[in-house]
Amino acid sequence: MSSKLLFPEDFILMGFTKYPWLDLPLFFALLISYMFTLLGNMALILVSQLDSQLQSPLYFFLTDLSCLDLCFATTTNITYIGCMAQAYIFHWLGCTECVLLGVMALDRCVAVCRPLRYSVIMDHKHCRRLSGTAWLVGLANSLLQSTLTVQLPLCGNQELDHFFCELPGLIKMACVDTTINEATLAVVATFLIMGPLSMILLSYGCIAQAAFHTCSSHLLVVSLFYGPGIYIYMQPSGDSPQDLTKALTLFYCVITPMANPFIYTLRNKDVKGALRRLLRSAILSKRI
């Protein structure tokens, strides 16, 4: 039985079609959140690149995270040519963020526990290597999981009970035994979620007493991202209500990217100072 390629014209994205009264509120909520996502992440990227005082590894990784969140939110708000293209990109970005959050925790651990050697250990070359590893691991996992999903036959099934093309929803559309796909997804997701999460908890466990104020923002972002991911991916398929799964997915792919730059900015004096200097320079340049 041959597989059927999925393109937007081939099937219907259901979303919350059982609750039509949610259409208009959801439209405006998603539009506003997407605009804040663009504004917040672009501002953080801009000040990190233009301000000479924000050239440390911390802001290198924050810039990387903001770029990732911009792509993440855009992937789930703008329709791509085909459903599979969206699935590949969405899964790639999600896996990359899992690994990148772990790398950022390692950076904080080195900064607090080894401050005298921090600039040597976390030099620019090493930061780029860690960032590249996160992106490559996410890409490799996306190629594996999405390719396995593409090959599943649909047997005429055209209704995808989701907002966009995410792998668990696509697997449920198949008309054959998907045990291998579900097991592979669960095993790899466990590794990619619990591996970085364990590294984060271990890193912050070592420095919690000495510098909790430097970690609280990152821990908040971690809880917002990993909490829904653990619930959605690390349980047997079909055990959770689909509406709850959709709501949690919407939370971590829309709300989290919007919240990340504000969480980091509002609790970071350096970033707030850089924003003020950037605005002051812009105002003075217009006067001149």
Question: Which residues are covered by each model-predicted region?
Answer:
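Transmembrane helical core of 7TM receptor-like proteins
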Residues: 1-288
